[in-house]
Every structure is written in structure tokens, then in C-alpha cells.
Curated annotation (Swiss-Prot):
Organism: Albidiferax ferrireducens (strain ATCC BAA-621 / DSM 15236 / T118) (Rhodoferax ferrireducens)
CDD domains per the UniProt record, alphabetical: IGPD
Keyword Lyase carried by entry: yes
EC class (word): lyase
Catalysed transformations (reactions): D-erythro-1-(imidazol-4-yl)glycerol 3-phosphate = 3-(imidazol-4-yl)-2-oxopropyl phosphate + H2O
Entry-linked Gene3D superfamilies: Imidazole glycerol phosphate dehydratase, domain 1 (3.30.230.40)
Cell location: Cytoplasm
Swiss-Prot/TrEMBL keywords: Amino-acid biosynthesis, Cytoplasm, Histidine biosynthesis, Lyase
Family to which this protein belongs: Belongs to the imidazoleglycerol-phosphate dehydratase family.
UniProt-recorded name of the protein: Imidazoleglycerol-phosphate dehydratase
The keyword GTP-binding is annotated on this UniProt entry: no
PROSITE patterns per record: IGP_DEHYDRATASE_1, IGP_DEHYDRATASE_2
Amino acid sequence: MSTPIALVPARTAEVTRNTAETRITVKVNLDGSGQSHLSTGIGFFDHMLDQIARHGLIDLDIQATGDLHIDGHHTVEDVGITLGQAVHQAVGDKKGIRRYGHAYVPLDEALSRVVIDFSGRPGLVMDVPFKSGMIGTFDAQLAHEFFQGFVNHAFVTLHIDNLKGENAHHQAETVFKAFARALRAALEFDPRALGQIPSTKGTL
């Protein structure tokens, strides 16, 4: 007999990562309402993380301090790693989830598509030709580092494509919003397959 959704354990996690370069704590509730408490020291990055919370309906608390006197690379990458670990821990055995999710999100002239698979196999394919190298104090190249860190530790396959865009802020925002929407879709429970692992292998 399938397990009612109400009896599924809370999908929450808290992960701390401390290195010589960064100190990061991430708390997630995959069945939240989109609340966020974010402090990474990089304003635009906080703005993008807020998109993940709001559009993914994930409660997200991220507190990070890093060697920003050098640049944002270690902070952004390590937040991706820690968030990936937290999501992997919170999602558990993946029973009953839809597994796959995709979303298209526009913002004015920009349009991005994100497709995700909770496959258990880390893989990132990202094609985002940013029109500017910097977005505020955020190095646009670090978007790739964030998603690579997430993918490697959430054990997901992720395809990200910016299909149109002339403004780098708009490009990034559509990418993060589409990621959030795809994540939300993949993590939703399928009422017709509760208690089942969504794979013919019987494991993910």
C-alpha cells in the first residue's frame, strides 16, 4: 500500500562545511514556503539564492563567510557544494518523487531553460554566454562553479541553457529562477507512485 504524503518524514537537513577558505552552514526544508535567510557577503549571489528559495518553495538558510578579500570563487563554489549536500540529505531515498523537472523562465529579453534529473549521477551541461563578465560584484563565471558544486554533491544531472539574452543580470536571473522551478517539479511527490523509487533499477 502506498504511503500517504502526510506520513512522509520531514525533508529537512542542516550541513556545515568549514575549510581554511570558508565557513558555511546551510539549512533546507524542501517542503517549505520559500522563506530565506541569506548572508554570503556577495549581494548579487544572495539575490540569486533568494530566487531558488522563492521559486522552488524551499525554505533556505545560508550563512557563509569566506576569503572575499581574494575573490568570490571559494565562497560561491563552497555554497554550491554545501547546498548540494543538504538537498541530497533532505531528499532521502527519493521514494515517491517525480525525479525529473524542467522549466523555461523569461525576463524581458532573456529566456533560459533548465532540466534536472535526480539520477544519482552527477553531470552538468551549462551553456550560458553571459554578455558581461561582472554583475555588480559577482563574477558571472562563478555561476558555473556554483552549479558544478551543487551537481557533484546533490548527485543530479543538470542541463542549463540560456536561449536568449542581452543583459547579464537578466540572463543570470532567468537561469536561477528556471533552476528553482525545475527543482521544485522534480522534488514534488507523485500521488500515483508514492512509496516507489522512480527507476526501473529500483534504486537511484
